[in-house]
A protein has these predicted regions:
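Single conserved hydrophobic/aromatic residue that forms the stacking wall/gate
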Residues: 308-317
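FIC/Doc superfamily catalytic core
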Residues: 1-41, 47-309
Length: 317
């Protein structure tokens, strides 16, 4: 039984990764060239809900046309892999309706609040955007008056949230590999291997704490140990979040990855989601430094705001 469970988990993780790659493709469809007068233009053709659609991409260039061809080829390969995984899941006895109604409702609740969650996390990272600006970036991928770095961070947060709210991902375990994938997404465009465990020393601004180099086996074991403790779901999520922050497992993006990883665990148990609201960020950062420098975890755990699925107002843990 354990072997089959592990097989299903690995297949679900692979399927979620493939779906994420498919969703992040800038163009999905078969490229076509249309001529108007002496000019040529590129479109992508795709069947949606039984109807053939044609979406304008841009003026024809050899480079853009080759990009569209590569995208189309990669999309076909991904869909072929997805069909193979679906067959393997069916043979392993996996059913799509294995998620409980609480978890399904929790996914919908988190999706409805995703823009605010991304905004709150951006504030925690020092991204200087207003909520309307953040919303514009999430919806359209760009905005004037905001640095390219901040836009990339916000888009990465959006993609990381979309990743964990995928049903296959929610059905997967909250383990080191899940955390590593989340870190890779939040570091996209900044580091080639953003989900790789840190191998160089780092310091933390405003703190005397110097995190030791993390050991992958130790990190895996500690995450497993926290999850297997007999504690309330929300307390486990907070412990996961703070442990990953303090350990500084990755070269960058640790707070972003830690919060989203904790939310993966929480949402997968139908427990709502964790937020650190904008107004609480200064106090949270102050207490986080205390926690880094040796204070008990309770000094900061009580400051983490928690939104429960059945109570849309924010409660203090």
């Amino acid at each position: 039984m354990a072997a089959k469970y592990n097989e299903i988990q690995e297949l679900l993780r692979s399927r979620a990764d493939l779906n994420a790659r498919l969703n992040l493709m800038p163009y999905d469809g078969t490229p076509e060239i249309k001529e108007r007068g002496n000019e040529k233009y590129l479109y992508v053709r795709k069947r949606v809900a039984g109807k053939q659609t044609s979406t304008y991409v841009g003026a024809y260039t050899e480079e853009l046309y080759n990009l569209l061809l590569r995208n189309a080829r990669e999309a076909r390969e991904i869909r072929k892999e997805l069909r193979s995984i679906d067959k393997q899941l069916a043979n392993a006895g996996y059913s799509e309706d294995e998620l409980s109604s609480d978890v399904i409702n929790n996914i919908a609740f988190a999706r409805a609040n995703m823009k605010m969650n991304v905004y709150d996390q951006a504030v925690l990272e020092g991204v200087a955007t207003s909520f309307p600006q953040t919303e514009e970036i999430i919806d359209n991928g760009k905005i004037s008056g905001v640095t390219a770095t901040d836009v990339q961070k916000i888009l990465n947060l959006k993609h990381a949230w979309e990743f964990i709210l995928d049903r296959d991902v929610i059905a997967s375990r909250s383990d080191y590999y899940m955390l590593s994938h989340i870190a890779r997404v939040v570091n996209e465009g900044f580091f080639a291997e953003g989900g790789r465990i840190r191998g160089v020393p780092v310091t933390i601004g405003g703190s005397s704490y110097v995190p030791p180099l993390p050991n992958e086996l130790d990190v895996k074991e500690k995450i497993r140990e926290i999850i297997e403790e007999s504690d309330e779901v929300i307390n486990t999520a907070i412990k996961l979040c703070l442990y990953c922050m303090k350990t500084q497992i990755f070269l960058d993006g640790n707070k972003r990855a830690s919060v989203i990883f904790a939310n993966h665990y929480l949402i997968s148990h139908g427990g709502g989601f964790l937020v650190i609201p904008e107004k609480e960020v200064p106090e949270f950062k102050r207490l986080l430094v205390k926690y880094y420098e040796g204070e008990d975890i309770t000094v900061i755990a009580d400051s983490v705001s928690y939104t429960h699925l059945t109570l849309p107002t924010k409660l203090e843990v």
